[in-house]
């Protein structure tokens, strides 16, 4: 009987190691899933911001800047400026007021902004829809967000003859 107990002496430790390994793998899988879900939610939000910017009459560059600002949490490492994050919030309004791409890059630039494809489509006339597709390419996966907003700016920008 004593020999039988000695042969099973490490079973509890082996079960514990396997359980900890399984729990760790589950944690990392859930963490990766949460990263992907967050990126998808933010891509949809960025598409909605760009579509809204187009719906109120902004140009394509302003739509691009609006979507990029919405994607800051999933845009990777900040390339410019290379300081701490304390001044990032104060740079966003300055970035949005930039008139050219070069001027905008001198204010804020992130690692994955170059690989972000933002397309804004708008119809013509009354009741047009602004649609936006945001494709965010990170190191290991691609996320797409879509949004559509009814365009109201023709009501306010053009004389309706009333």
Question: In which residue ranges do the predicted regions lie?
Answer:
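Alpha-helical assembly-interface signal, strongest on the long, hydrophobic N-terminal helix that forms
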Residues: 2-80
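Short, conserved structural patches
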Residues: 56-162
């Amino acid at each position: 009987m004593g020999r039988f107990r000695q042969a099973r002496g490490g079973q509890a430790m082996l079960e514990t190691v396997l359980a900890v390994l399984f729990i760790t793998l589950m944690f990392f899988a859930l963490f990766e899933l949460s990263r992907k879900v967050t990126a998808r939610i933010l891509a949809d939000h960025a598409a909605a911001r760009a579509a809204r910017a187009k719906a109120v009459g902004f140009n394509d560059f302003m739509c691009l800047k609006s979507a990029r600002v919405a994607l800051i949490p999933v845009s990777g490492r900040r390339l410019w400026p290379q300081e701490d994050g304390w001044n990032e919030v104060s740079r966003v309004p300055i970035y949005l007021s930039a008139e050219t791409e070069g001027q905008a890059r001198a204010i804020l630039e992130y690692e994955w902004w170059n690989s972000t494809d933002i397309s804004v489509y708008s119809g013509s006339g009354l009741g047009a829809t602004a649609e936006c597709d945001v494709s965010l390419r990170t190191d290991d996966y691609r996320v797409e967000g879509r949004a559509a907003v009814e365009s109201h700016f023709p009501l306010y920008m053009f004389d309706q003859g009333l």
